[in-house]
Amino acid sequence: TLAKSLGSGVPVGACLVNENISSKLKLNDLGTTFGGGMIAMAAVCATFEAIEQDGMIANATAVEKRSRDSLANVSGVVGVRGKGCLLGIEFDGPCKPYHEKLLNHKIITGTSSTPNVLRLLPPLCVKTDEIDLFASVISELENA
């Protein structure tokens, strides 16, 4: 199942199945109270149109590459994991000080259950210059 961001703020959920399961489902096999609501489905369509028209998938690929390249030579950064705009930056020590200092620079990041991993979860429309700013702040913090 998935839900987040499908409707750009309008509550929507989805259930994805593989081809094997899909071939066994027939029309009207499943019933829902709110399934297929017109407003929700219009929001989903508009979201997918915006993703396609604004080239957000290609942008996410560019953001991932820029993030990896920008952080490759920053001391203290052990590695970058993830795909597209959903990345985990692994440090050689706890990342909590970075998380707090980035927040002071108005850069919001996420923490992880792994204390050395900082989560970067920008929107798909993030610009590469914003990633450069993130990397430069990390570098400044590392050199401070």
Where does each model-flagged region fall?
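Conserved N-terminal phosphate-binding loop of PLP-dependent enzymes in the Aspartate aminotransferase
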Residues: T1-A144
